[in-house]
Structure formats: structure tokens, C-alpha cells
Swiss-Prot record:
Disulfide bonds join 3-16, 8-21, 15-30, 23-28. The lineage of its organism: Eukaryota, Metazoa, Ecdysozoa, Arthropoda, Chelicerata. It comes from Cupiennius salei (American wandering spider). The presence of a 'disulfide through disulfide knot' structurally defines this protein as a knottin. The keyword Disulfide bond applies. This is Toxin CSTX-19. One of its GO terms (cellular component) is extracellular region.
Length: 35
């Protein structure tokens, strides 16, 4: 699963849950931790 966060910043830092994520256009996506 991937959580999606808006306001993507260069480097994709702390976009989702304070974890590194990939920037796709103006949206950033990062893996979600299911524990």
C-alpha cells in the first residue's frame, strides 16, 4: 500500500509519515508501514 501526500518537496523528504518517498508530479508517494 502507498500513502499519498500533497505538497511534494524536492528530495521527497518527510512527505508521508516523515519517511522518504518518491515525488510524482506535485504529489509524493511513499510505502506505508503495516505492522
Amino acid at each position: 500500500n502507498y500513502c499519498v501526500a500533497k505538497r511534494c518537496r524536492p528530495g521527497g523528504r518527510q512527505c508521508c509519515s516523515g519517511k522518504p518517498c518518491a515525488c510524482v508530479g506535485k504529489v509524493c508517494k511513499c510505502p506505508r508501514d503495516n505492522s
